[in-house]
Amino acid sequence: MWGQLPRLSGRRRRLQYPVMSSGNPSAPPAAEPVSALYDTRLPHLSRWRRMQIPLIAAAVIAVVRMLGPTLRFESLGLYFQQSHARGEAVISAFWHRCIISATWYWRNRGVVVMNTTNFDGQWTRRVIEHFGFGTAQGSSTRGGLRGLAVMARRLEEGFDSAFTIDGPRGPRYIAKPGPVMLARKTGRAIYVFHIGVEKALTLERAWDKMQIPHPFSRAVMVGAPLIFVSPDADAEELKRKHAEMQAALERVRDVAESWFGLSEEERQRLREELNAKV
């Protein structure tokens, strides 16, 4: 679980633009996807499945583009700005449940996302690259170490990375160790967040209970203080950091998903608490 990341050989690619910058949400997407940095061999797909990929991607893109501009976001706990102020990128982690709202919130900032090479991963890759994300092909079960190595290189170049931490297929709300491994390798901080929406359609039969926001819904992005992992961390320390990340993910989900049921006094108290050290 806590193996070493492989090295990447080859020429270092030039940084094209800073990422996850709160000041420029409409920066142009990268000219070259991060997946171009290494050989990614796709699993065999039937002709019918290959035909479905662009159709599904187009439908999802249309939904996100239709819903996204109508959402009214409030942002709390923007701790990633502490790393950005030092000129360092961060490693973000969030639950798959809020992937639609997260895609819109972090769009066009060059964030590099771990992406699987299976059928679902192929249409997902088209969607997230359309919205200005980079992709590193891999998952917890296939090609993950190679994907982490690509993300490590991009972090060094100034690009933030992100994990749907219980993906690609669950179990729901159980964090995988990728961000902790990457943080030990690179020295970059882990930033966990969750997005809650006031009104949404929940896909109850989906493994992740994905939420599709209703048009014009209010939404809140809640982040937690940064988590740092020493490059000398042993297996026990890595387990502790993994548990710390799991607890932080649960905390921000609880706050974000209960937010619109709280009184204004309770929300104001939480605003002050979450923003006190940002």
Model-identified regions with their sequence ranges:
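Non-catalytic C-terminal accessory region of glycerolipid acyltransferases
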Residues: Q16-G68, H130, L145-V278
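Short, flexible loop segments at the rims of nucleotide/cofactor-binding pockets, characterized by
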Residues: L67-R72, V90-I91, G138-R142, P168-R169
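Short amphipathic alpha-helical segments and helix-helix/interface helices
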Residues: F80-Q81, T103, R125, P179-V180
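Catalytic core of membrane glycerolipid acyltransferases/transacylases, capturing the structured
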Residues: E88-R146, T186, T202-L203
